[in-house]
Amino acid sequence: NILFPLQNLKGEDKLSKEEMLERAQKVASLVQIDELMERKPSELSGGQQQRVAIARALVKMPRVLLLDEPLSNLDARLRLQTREEIRRIQRETNITTVFVTHDQEEAMSISDEIVIMKLGVVQQIGKPQDVYDNPANLFVAKFLGTPPINVFNGVIKNGGVYIAEDRILDADIEDMDVYV
């Protein structure tokens, strides 16, 4: 199953059977499924099948690897374990990896850099901790964090920031409605 992407290579990219087997074995070892090489996909657990899928993607030695919701079908325990494995594999191979997820915990824990999008529009790009500490807008602020950030409607008036009737800060800027 891991060999399949290599069997379709053409021209100068084409590999000998020995080269294909060597690459497949190396990648299987990297994703820790080398002892499962003789099994059929139907004989593998969900986590093992996910590792085979990652191995198939890695065996071609891409410059960029796209993983689109790779953990979405795994149970919570396996998600955590596989997430750590993906991070380890990415670091060992040094392949630029685009990891698409709707799970903020996955994004924050696995990424060197994150892109927060809303309806296909980029809201913010940055290192996870920087984005968390300095959200670019209210959407990003509400999207990140467990538990979610507390947001209050406030107003700036007469040189102060108010929540309800309580003055909480001095603010020497024009009067306006704000989120605090």
What are the functions of these language-model segments?
Residues N1-F139:
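ABC ATPase nucleotide-binding domains
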Residues P41, P135, P147, E165-R167:
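Short, well-ordered turn and helix-capping elements at secondary-structure junctions
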Residues A53-I54, F152, V161:
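Residue-level recognition of conserved structural "scaffold" positions that shape functional pockets
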Residues Q90, N153, L169-D170:
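Short secondary-structure boundary/capping segments
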Residues G126, G159-G160:
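Intrinsic-disorder/low-complexity loop/linker signature
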Residues N134-K157:
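C-terminal boundary and immediately downstream tail of ABC-type ATPase nucleotide-binding domains
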Residues G160-V180:
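Glycine/charge-rich catalytic "coupling/switch" loops of P-loop NTPases
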